[in-house]
Amino acid sequence: MKDLQLVLFVLGAIAIIAVLVHGFWSIRKQQPKSMKQSPMAGFYKDQAKRRDSEGFDADGIGQVRVRKPGEVEETVIKPVLKTNLSQKPHSGTTKLTDTPLQDSLRQPGPHKTEPEHVEPKVVQPAQQSLFVGDDVKPAPTASTSMNTPKKIFNPSTSTAKLESYTGKPVAARPEPIKPPIQPAAPKVDVKAEVEEVKAEVEVKSTLKADAPVNEPVEPTDVLVLHIFAKAGEQIQGAELLPSLLSLNFKFGDMDIFHRHIDNAGTGKVLFSLANMLKPGIFDPDNMEQFVTQGVVLFMTLPGYGDPLMNFTIMLNSAYQIAEDLGAELLDGQRQPWSDATKKDYLRRLNAA
């Protein structure tokens, strides 16, 4: 048993050592090689030894040098300015020669650099108008002043000369537009208008005074219809109110409902509806708790408009309410409504 433990211990130690060795080897393999271990290190050292005192190698290639911006301007820009100033001014017109190009190439001689011809910049009309009143002239550049002829512009030239110089017509200055003269408004005689208005008011007042005044007439008769609940039943306010609103009744004076000439509830009253029980009024805020044995519809004679038409509307409304509530329609004496009672009511309407 002890020998087995020893063997396992040795095998475990060997496995741990193998894992560590493999890990170090893989890490070293992944690291980049340094310059000392690079095969090109010796090549760069040999190239450095072969450079001369000025820093150029056998092929004439020197080391890379970094120069400041000031050094570049001194070495490049200054020689260009010197060559431009040393050149002779070039005339504005070029002469054409008959010498062919091949002859000029065959002739030996020192090579001369011909100055490049720079086309003169044409000043726009908007820019020229700025110099008409100013005597300050722009400073000529080194390239354009030597190659282009100077054009002298005289500020005292006329408009026609300016048009010929620029090649574009100068727009004429718009003349100020004078506002149109409005005709004077005619004078209104205020006093005359006031007098006319006063005269119209006086005429209207006299017409109203002469017109007969419709004084309220005392009623001579009252037509009454009763809607009575059936035996053992009562009329519920929650059912009565929707029926009245559908028939265009409106709650109003004396705390009862009225039917007006207008369906919106305005105008003269045609007939009214009251509670059969005393005091005969309604409480619209508590109609759900309201109960009664019956209601009464009444219309006074004479009334507004056609009495026969008004009674027809009242009779139809009574029929509809009785049907909605399941009640009975009675006459003024609380008797069942009949044809004989209807004829009696028509006679009373004609007598009124």
Swiss-Prot record:
GO terms for cellular component: cell division site; plasma membrane. Signal peptide: none annotated. Residues 78-120, 138-160 are annotated as: Disordered. It is a single-pass type I membrane protein. SUPFAM superfamilies: Cell-division protein ZipA, C-terminal domain. One of its GO terms (biological process) is division septum assembly. Pfam families: ZipA_C (PF04354). InterPro entries: Cell_div_ZipA, ZipA_FtsZ-bd_C, ZipA_FtsZ-bd_C_sf. Residues 111-120 have a biased composition (Basic and acidic residues). The chain crosses the membrane at residues 7-27. Residues 28-352 are cytoplasmic. Residues 83-105, 141-160 have a biased composition (Polar residues). Keywords: Cell cycle, Cell division, Cell inner membrane, Cell membrane, Membrane, Transmembrane, Transmembrane helix. Residues 1-6 are periplasmic. It is found in: Cell inner membrane. Belongs to the ZipA family. NCBIfam families: septum_zipA (TIGR02205). Interacts with FtsZ via their C-terminal domains. Essential cell division protein that stabilizes the FtsZ protofilaments by cross-linking them and that serves as a cytoplasmic membrane anchor for the Z ring. Also required for the recruitment to the septal ring of downstream cell division proteins. This is Cell division protein ZipA. The gene is zipA.
